[in-house]
Amino acid sequence: MATKKRALSFSEKHQKLVDEKFRKSLNIQVMNKLERQAKNQVVQNENDEKVERQRFLRVLQNEQFELDMEEAIQKAEANKMLRDRQLEQEERLANELARLKHESLKDKKMRQQVRENSIELRELEQKLKAAYMNKERAAQIVEKDAMKYEQMKRDAEIERIMMEEHDRLLKEESAKQERRNKERAQYYLDLEKQLEDQERRKQEAYEQLLKEKLMIDEIVRKIYEEDQVERQQKLEKKNAIQKYIEEFQRAQDFWRQKKREEMEEENRKIIEFANIQEQREGERMARVHEIEEKRVQRQNLLMKQLEETLRQRDDLEQVRQELYQEEQAEIIKLKVKEEAELRLRRQREMKQDFEDQMALKELILQAAKEEEETFKKAMLAKFAEDDRIELMNAQKQRMKQLEHKRAVEKLIEERRSQFLADKQRELEELQLQQRRQGCINEIIEEERLRLLKEHAAKLLGYLPKGVFKREDDVDMLGEEFRKAYQKRDGV
């Protein structure tokens, strides 16, 4: 029993092991199957997700394409609208530019017509042209005076060069004469030295002669001592020698006197020559001073003549300018007076025309009223005559008369309205004419100020009287111009 139990237990265990292995194997299979199913499910899910994603992406792409198309259409429409607005703006701008250009051309033409027809502007232009002519004439006069002054300067320069050349030649001649005088003085000095040398040699010869004489005297004395007989002979000989010595001394004295006289004569000639040279130099310097004084006097005379000529010319030009300006001022005054009289006459005429128009209007109104009454009566009579036969009934006749009266009043009202419309149109035309005249006056004033701004500064000092109508015109041109103009006007 126990063995059986043990055997059973073993088989149970074995069976359990087998069952357990089977379960494990089954579990493994199940797990593998589940894993495969899970993998398949995952793959299926991934495929489904991929398909769904692709479908979603296609939907998104389609929606994005639709959005892009819609946005492109909106952009195209917006661009078209923008282009249309731009074209419209460009067209408006072109029209505005054309209008401005047309108005500018119209304004230019109007200004041109105003400039051509305005007496004031023409007179201002004539004054400015006259000022330019005065300026040009003054410039020509200044240029001529400058040319004459330059010619005088050139003449004075030529004269100065000639005087310098003359002075140079005189100095060279004086230097040559001084060299000759020095050479002559040196020659006389050398001659005097030679004479002194000759005198010295003669003195030495004389001393030598005296020595010989002493020797002779000594010999004579010895001879006299030795021989009395011979003494007489020696005495005679001595007398002869003494006579010879005396003759020699006389000859020497005569020669010395002659040399002294020659030297005195030579010194006198030298002194006389020096005096002559000094006198000549004094005369030359006097001539130079005289020539220089004459040149200065001539130059001063020419300068005075030039100054007098320029002064006379300036005075003449000033008188001419004053006369011209007075004539222009008188002409301008006459023109201004004529314009004032013309304006006054026009104002009177306009006033008279207005009064005449008002009187005529009253007459017309009165005549219109009378005509209306006459017309009214005539029409009433006509209507009454026309309807008298047809209207037998008094009530109908009164109604017809009222109808005729209303018709007549309507006609009268229409004629009155037409008359008032005509008068209103005439008044508007008059106001338009006044505005146009005011615009023309503004253009004339603007053109006048423009001409002054453009030309007044260039013509300062040459502007005739009457160019500036008001003090504001001068102030308009600037502080510097005003000061210069007031300074010149004060001068």
Curated annotation (Swiss-Prot):
Q: What is this protein called?
A: Meiosis-specific nuclear structural protein 1
Q: What gene is this protein translated from? A: Mns1
Q: Which keywords appear in this protein's UniProt record, sorted alphabetically? A: Cell projection, Cilium, Coiled coil, Cytoplasm, Cytoskeleton, Flagellum, Meiosis, Nucleus, Phosphoprotein
- Species: Mus musculus
The coiled-coil segments of this chain are: 29-253, 287-410
- Biological process terms in GO annotation: cilium organization; flagellated sperm motility; left/right axis specification; meiotic cell cycle; positive regulation of cilium assembly; sperm axoneme assembly; spermatogenesis
Q: Where in the cell is it found?
A: Nucleus; Cytoplasm, Cytoskeleton, Flagellum axoneme; Cytoplasm, Cytoskeleton, Cilium axoneme
The entry sums up its family as follows:
Belongs to the MNS1 family.
Q: What happens when the gene is disrupted?
A: MNS1-deficient mice display situs inversus and hydrocephalus. They are sterile, exhibit a sharp reduction in sperm production, and remnant spermatozoa are immotile with abnormal short tails.
